[in-house]
Amino acid sequence: MRLPTPAIRRGALAILVAAVIVVGIGLPASAQRRWVVAFANLTEEPGVTLEGTGFTGPEVRESFTLAARPYPIDLVLYDNRRDDARAAANAEAAIARRVDLYVQYHHGGTANATVGQKLKAAGIPALAINDPVPGAPLYALDNAGAGRVAGEALAQFAARAWSGQSTVAVVIGRVSAAAERVPERVRGVTGALRERLPGARLTTLDTHGNPAQVAPLLGAFLSANPSRKVLIAATDDATALAAKTAVETVGRALDAAIVGQGVDRTIHGGINDRKEIDPANRNSIVIGSVAFYLDRLGYEVLPLALRMLRGEAVPSRTLTPHKLITAANVFIEYPPYDMN
């Protein structure tokens, strides 16, 4: 049998390589390496809000479920129930299941340390949300940074709309809720206001998480400042809306500007809901709210997890890119078709 010439052999090899490349490019998702990622949520309890905002655990869980769709990830979900023993048990269950990576969202240093030790012993990498797990990269809210965004927005509004007029500022909401790091938010607000409006007197009013306290507390403050313009930094969106009602009830809407924190559904609305921050409502005294994006947490965390699984380096700490959402940009951040 006559052997093919070198030129023919080289041509055949080139065709074979090209075919392999084409087949590789066309591999269906089912043929790619898939990773099993466990996500242990802080809580799934209905009506319980997270991190001093209006977001709930089911919203966070849904963000992970939706974000995982385009990735080669099989998601395993756990509920830590805000309970240390449950958090440890969930980690043990994930280890028994031999997951490839564990995402831990739990408030509790001791429990997180225990979970971290168990995962390390099992050779499973971890990624922490908001509260550290020893040795794991952390994705966290930047409460102080979010507060600064709110304070700067209020100061800019005052400089633009009330230049030369006597102005006071008040931070209202669950200002002492240390477990949710709200005091960091308050410090960010007051720091920015002191830098930008050094002549404005600052006051904090603590509702202790009770929206019914907004009207009497803010009403008394407004009565004590009858001829001044009032900047109102609310620690969450529900408080911002309650503050708006309180201000309008006493006829002081022309003297006030409000910024909230969170950008949850109570303020930007679903497709069939009333929307306080909306291009059609540009004259609202709620001039904006600082986005926390907890309803999109999965979209931020899962790409980090995938990089870790592929052996890529990730930052030891990644912070939420908080942004002021106003009537001018709300449809960019939350398009109408995405308000479901």
Q: Where do the PLM segments sit?
A:
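Hinge/cleft segment of the Venus flytrap/periplasmic-binding protein
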Residues: L13, R33-W35, G173, L193, ...
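Bacterial N-terminal signal peptides
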Residues: A14-G24
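Extracytoplasmic "Venus flytrap"
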Residues: R34-A68, V76-A88, H106-G109, L138, ...
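Short, solvent-exposed amphipathic alpha-helices that sit
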Residues: E51-P70, A146-A150, E180-A200, Q213, ...
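Short beta-strand elements at the ligand-binding edges of bilobed clamshell
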Residues: D79, P132-Q156, I172-S176, E276-D295
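Hydrophobic alpha-helical
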Residues: L101-K120, V189, T203-N272
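Flexible loop/hinge segments that line or gate small-molecule binding clefts
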Residues: T110-G145, R265-I277
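Hydrophobic alpha-helical segments within soluble ligand-binding/sensing domains
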Residues: Y139-V168, E184, V214-A215, D264-G270, ...
